[in-house]
Design a protein with these regions (language model features):
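Conserved SAM/AdoMet-binding glycine-rich loop
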Residues: 104-107, 114-116, 218-340, 351
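Radical SAM enzyme [4Fe-4S]-AdoMet core and its adjacent flexible, acidic
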Residues: 40, 236-255, 302-305, 365-396
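Short, solvent-exposed loop/turn segments at secondary-structure boundaries
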Residues: 82-84, 201-206, 236-241, 301-304, ...
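Short flexible coil/turn linkers enriched for glycine and charged/polar residues
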Residues: 173-176, 186-188, 283, 293, ...
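Proteins enriched for Cys/Gly/acidic motifs involved in redox and nucleic-acid/cofactor modification
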Residues: 1-234, 272, 309-320, 344, ...
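Terminal RNA-binding accessory module
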Residues: 373-469
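Conserved, mostly hydrophobic/aromatic
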Residues: 190, 227, 261, 289, ...
Length: 469
């Protein structure tokens, strides 16, 4: 059964919030915090809670580290380059710390949940005052207070799985789109993946808590809700309340909004889930289903618990049930022991599925995973060649993928000004497709209808038909 933090512990942290607030109130100017979340949407969501706690402690926010009184990096551990970026950023803060001895530097998240990384940071980066893992984020007020009042340096990396803290304050990045975590952790232990080690075992939030949060966001005017979890398809096993049932209940909430979710695992994706999406009023017609590889031999080595036949059957059912379903995926190139024949299996699967887009990565060795100990005879040069070959295949598919929408009138959530220089507005359709269209700034946050006229490799463009709210 999932454990939740008891109210007494949260009240203790609230007392620390008030203590830090009192200290900050004595300053001549409001202290500023710089918070940077690296990596996935779950980290971004955690960063919003961190900002919520900091705001209650009396901090304002700045995008510039040079102006900050507190700098906090919320880190990612999925790939080595993400860790290298963090170390580079922390190293660059050394001069700031020398100029301002009162500057507080904190590093949290998945990267420092790894013991060897946490110890390296403690020994090699003395400018870092607070190091905290993924399971103790709610105790940040206490760690900051102890630094301010006692100049205490903190390393808090508990090995036990975290518990769920309900009711933490949130400062959301958007007034239109909101993320709602529905579960934490992962039980799959794919051999290449560090997530179960840094996020712990699967823990689902109670259905009534999720439903209440989503209702509140819709009532507050949010137009898109993104449901988050390392494996949302395995939600609710503790409560006999599966993910398809949760989606069905959320879809009943009155209002004009869109529901989307990530990330899914093919072994837990079911016809029931696909049917729920197809029959819904609000759920996105976009299915992100990471395949990782098109070789059954390598899928077994990855401990993925499905084969390509099962995966293709799910895709074909989704195409049958969900109108013009948008399909995206994740693919790893160069897994230890992968041969060129294995790689060609991935190429053929990509051609058969015809993804709208694919997030493709060269294998990144993660210390502590089973794959890290596997022989890896593939040269970096070959991995690079395979990677580029796969990108070429996907790009050729993606160039024409969105042509199926030409002539359709689609509803789009207007999110802002487009990236091009032609003054178009932009947003996403129910399929998760980027849609650029002629419009005005006052449409931001509203649903509009657009007639699609042109398909591009990564977006579509069209003509505004109507503003719907």
């Amino acid at each position: 059964m999932t454990k939740e933090i008891n109210k007494e512990e949260l009240l203790i942290q609230q007392e620390y919030i008030e203590k830090v607030k009192a200290i900050n109130a004595k300053r001549e100017q409001m202290p500023l915090a710089h918070v940077h979340s690296f990596g996935c949407q779950q980290n971004v969501s955690d960063g919003e809670k961190i900002k919520g706690m900091l705001a209650q402690m009396g901090y304002g926010f700045t995008p510039e580290t040079a102006f900050a009184d507190l700098i906090l990096f919320n880190t990612c551990a999925v790939r080595e380059n993400a860790e290298d970026r963090v170390f580079g950023n922390i190293g660059a803060l050394k001069k700031l710390k020398e100029k301002n001895r009162n500057l507080i530097i904190a590093v949290g998240g998945c990267m420092v949940q790894q013991e060897h990384i946490a110890q390296r940071m403690r020994k090699s980066f003395p400018q870092v005052d607070i190091i905290f893992g993924t399971h103790v984020m709610h105790t940040l007020p206490q760690m900051i207070y102890e630094k301010l009042s006692e100049n205490r340096r903190t390393l808090s990396i508990p090995e036990s799985d975290g518990v769920i803290a309900e009711g933490l304050p949130v400062i959301r990045e958007s007034k239109v789109k909101a993320s709602v975590p529905i579960m934490y952790g992962c039980n799959n232990f794919c051999t290449y993946c560090i997530v179960p080690f840094v996020r712990g075992r699967e823990r689902s939030r109670r259905p009534e808590e999720v439903i209440a949060e989503v209702k509140g966001l819709i009532n507050d005017g949010y137009k898109e809700i993104l449901l988050l979890g390392q494996n949302v398809n395995s939600y609710g096993k503790e409560y006999d309340f599966g993910f398809a049932k949760l989606l069905s209940e959320l879809d009943k909430i009155p209002g004009k909004y869109k529901l989307s979710f990530m990330t899914s695992h093919p072994k837990d994706c079911t016809h029931e889930l696909i049917d729920t999406i197809a029959d819904s009023r609000h759920i996105s017609y976009h299915l992100h289903l990471p395949v990782q590889c098109g070789s059954d031999r390598i899928l077994k080595e990855m401990n993925r618990h499905y084969d390509t036949a099962h995966y293709i059957e799910l895709i074909e059912y989704a195409k049958k049930r969900i109108p013009k379903v948008a399909l995206t995926t994740d693919i790893i190139v160069g897994f230890p022991g992968e041969t060129y024949e294995d790689f060609l299996g991935t190429v053929e699967l990509m051609k058969k599925v015809r993804y709208d887009s694919a997030y493709t990565f060269i294998y990144s060795k993660r210390e502590g995973t089973k794959a890290a100990a596997m022989p890896d005879p593939i040269s970096d040069e070959d991995k690079g060649k395979w990677f580029r070959q796969l990108l070429d295949v996907q790009n050729s598919i993606g160039e024409k993928a969105y042509e199926r929408f030409i002539g359709d009138e689609v509803e789009v959530l207007c999110e802002g000004i487009g990236r091009t220089a032609d003054g178009l507005m932009t947003g996403h359709s129910r399929h998760g497709v980027i849609v650029d269209f002629n419009g005005t700034r006052d449409m931001i946050g509203k649903y509009v209808t657009v007639r699609i006229q042109k398909a591009l490799p990564w977006a579509v463009t069209g003509e505004l038909v109507s503003v719907n709210d």
